[in-house]
């Protein structure tokens, strides 16, 4: 489901009012091969959120969530925890035993937003070297737009 809330905008270069041909908001449900469901949302109109980029994965026994605004931490909930200890725990993911982190600073020091692009470039170059596809692929990205 998509929606364009603002149907016309002034072109920044020409000053002419033009029809808007892109979506201001999108949401879709998906059904994964393993039987689980997914909900994806994006919008330009989430006031109060500056570049909000989050994911949350919930399962029968555990859940994880991550937020770009706090990209060095992953939150984890384990339903098997003892009742009096149940709750979300925060995992600092910049120690050297986490993927990619052995290539950066001493364990525990934070990385920034730009470091994630270095990781993407490394994955891309590794895929060229090995011949194995990295993910997401251009086709996967295109398929989300159909």
Where do the model's predicted regions map?
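Rossmann-like dinucleotide-binding domain that binds NAD(P)(H)
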Residues: 1-51, 139
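A generic structural motif
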Residues: 31-33, 58, 75-77
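Surface loops and adjacent helix of pleckstrin homology
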Residues: 43, 69, 76-79
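C-terminal helical cap and adjacent loop that interface with cofactors, partners, or active-site loops
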Residues: 55-58, 82-146
């Amino acid at each position: 489901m998509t929606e364009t809330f603002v149907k016309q905008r002034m072109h920044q270069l020409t000053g002419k009012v033009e029809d808007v041909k892109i979506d201001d908001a999108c949401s879709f449900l998906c059904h994964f091969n393993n039987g689980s469901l997914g909900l994806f949302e994006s919008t330009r109109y989430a006031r109060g959120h500056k570049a909000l980029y989050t994911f949350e994965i919930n399962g029968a026994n555990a859940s994880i969530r991550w937020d770009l605004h706090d990209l060095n931490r992953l939150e984890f909930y384990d339903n098997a925890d003892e009742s009096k200890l149940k709750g979300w725990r925060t995992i600092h993911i910049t120690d050297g035993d986490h993927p990619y982190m052995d290539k950066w600073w001493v364990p525990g020091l934070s990385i920034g937003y730009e470091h994630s692009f270095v990781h993407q470039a490394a994955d891309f170059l590794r895929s060229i070297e090995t011949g194995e596809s990295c993910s997401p692929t251009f086709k996967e990205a295109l398929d989300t737009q159909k």
